[in-house]
């Protein structure tokens, strides 16, 4: 596909308004040294450009835009609406959010506005309109960046009133609400819309973050995601009313729980996101999150933020080791990014982000390790130009990721507090990552026909239409892999009666009678037909085969001998049911069989400790070969002879790759 950009955007957040003019001039020289070609500006400038209710002052922003335009930078223009000016909060305190404990916030920090405040909406839309009018003719503005990292929660009266409106639109009648939420439980029946209150610590969620009514709490999550999305759309539409062909985005946050990003992506021209792994985040988790961001629109995405060196807000803000930032950046491109952008370009001198990494450090020179590594990456990206732009990642495997399931599964008050949705998804993704098998992260309403294998771990909530969609996929020859805690509830978190796994029971060929929860110090053992045994933990389904072939059984406890892994023929395809959390080797045993029988393989045949990820154009395949391990690895023989896009030299059989080494090898198709 054609890229939305003419070059790889390389730059990041830039706040010259925090510095005197002589620093601006020095920055321009340093940016050229680092081969930086883009800047994200105006992210938190609302107070500067609108100093009072009826006054705008664009003088400084005009100077910044002119400076960057004269230097031929691609500008990412933010709308500044993520941090409210003090005058607004003073005059209109209702613009601030009310937190989980029922306390209304005062001025300060960010991520604390009420998305259902009509005052906030009015002034945010007006500001976006003024910015679009003022800079509509500037050809250097490549992207419009709405708000910043939408997040936070509000439980104020405005939100409560709008929640009731949202419910009326969704359910039409109170009888339908009562039925969906099963309000006969604990005598919660509603007879008037005004009786419905927001679910927070003062109401349904008063016990340790869990909820008395997951149906109510999950609906509030849906409502709040929609409320935030409406704010985004309000500003987006204001910009597009002036600039119809504007490329509009907002920066997402990976597996952030608060917002349904698949729904958001439908309203975004391009997905962008901020990547901040911790010092101990597995590289497979980083890769999975990139794939999720790519999967939101099934298109290349923008990396809007990463740090060139260290964060400031995690528990342990370790430095990126020499070569790590470069390798991490290439992993980002490998999984679908068409931009590499940092937060930030010059390190802040004050505030809570003064220790957050930047291209230009507090010493204020270009003679630092981080600057030199940034410049090296900039030179390399500039040298191979547009060749990777718009190229696609192709996959035979899809993994379902669904925010409704994310919310509902973690709201449920049983059977274990240790069940975490993202961890379960990653447990399966990691197998494919280690095998260098390309994966698409897909929504429940995606096109399943593109895949040979679909994994749906902990598909707890099977909503309307999902059963039929999955059945059609399997009947047509697809392989479905699902697990414990699947098929349990409907879209309102009411149990599918008739035995677990509910709507999946027929195609899986099993009936789950009970679910045993194992404490962290407990485990069981699973034995396969060849006698090989593997540990399992967390949960154990006690299930009965109803036509499915038993591949493995439990070895201990009163359910010893009962099935732990099954395989069922359904139409032309197969359904694997994994009834417990298997250790990695045991899961690999199951997934090896599932992938081999439908000829799903890695991007190369050889086994290797290197990550190898592919992007393709119509006539070229690019192999991104990266070493994220502590060991040296030899380049797989099948890649020898291909030209490295970075060096221009042909790779040789026996080439040794040290930790953080990267090659981008080209193959003509």
Region annotations inferred by a language model:
Residues 1-23, 28-38:
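An acidic-aromatic substrate-binding cleft motif
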Residues 6-8, 35-37, 69-75, 137-142, ...:
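Short, well-ordered coil/turn segments that N-cap beta-strands
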Residues 9-19, 44-59, 106-125, 147-154, ...:
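The substrate-binding groove and active-site-proximal loops of carbohydrate-active enzymes
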Residues 12, 31, 39, 68, ...:
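Conserved, mostly hydrophobic/aromatic
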Residues 18-33, 124-130, 253-264, 321-329:
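Short, acidic/polar
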Residues 26-32, 40-103, 132, 235-242, ...:
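Aromatic-lined substrate-binding rim segments of carbohydrate-active enzymes
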Residues 102-270, 274-291:
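Polysaccharide-binding and catalytic clefts of secreted carbohydrate-active enzymes
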Residues 196-200, 245, 254, 265, ...:
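Carbohydrate-binding surfaces of carbohydrate-active enzymes
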